[in-house]
A protein has these predicted regions:
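Conserved acidic residues
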Residues: 21
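Class I (Rossmann-like) S-adenosyl-L-methionine-dependent methyltransferase catalytic domain
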Residues: 1-18, 32-123
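A conserved beta-strand element that flanks and buttresses the S-adenosyl-L-methionine
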Residues: 24
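Short catalytic micro-motifs in class I SAM-dependent methyltransferases
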Residues: 27-31
Length: 123
């Protein structure tokens, strides 16, 4: 298996001249504003091959408090991936947080997140 790692502007994915079988987003989607999230999701659609899959982890609205990134409701994920995507799963999960970071205050067991798998339909 070959993996490609890129450092670039995630809002400029449509400018990338290559496509991939799979894309992993571990904690990026939840940092964007509504408008930027739409741009990001549109860009993701351009870099995934037909039949490709996006594996995504983002903070859940089920995580209490306000520390950390924006919380994303499940409905927002369903809406974001309603067009040009096939939602395979949106499941609750948790991030593992380093134990030595004492100033963080998240739920027992780690912050609640959504583990999402969406696919690009085959042509």
């Amino acid at each position: 298996m070959t993996a490609t790692f890129l450092v670039m502007d995630a809002l400029a994915l449509k400018d990338l001249p290559e496509v991939f079988d799979n894309v992993i987003d571990s904690g990026l989607l939840h940092v964007f504003s509504d408008d930027d999230r739409r741009r990001y999701v549109e860009g993701l659609a351009t870099v995934l091959k037909p039949g490709g899959r996006l594996f995504l982890l983002c903070f859940s609205d089920q995580e209490p408090g306000t520390q950390g990134p924006r919380r994303v409701p499940k409905k927002e994920l369903e809406t974001a991936f309603a067009k040009r995507w096939s939602i395979e799963s949106i499941e609750p999960s948790r991030y593992e947080v380093r134990r030595d970071l004492k100033d963080l205050s998240f739920s027992e067991g780690g912050p609640k997140i959504w583990s999402v798998v969406v696919g690009r339909p085959s042509i």
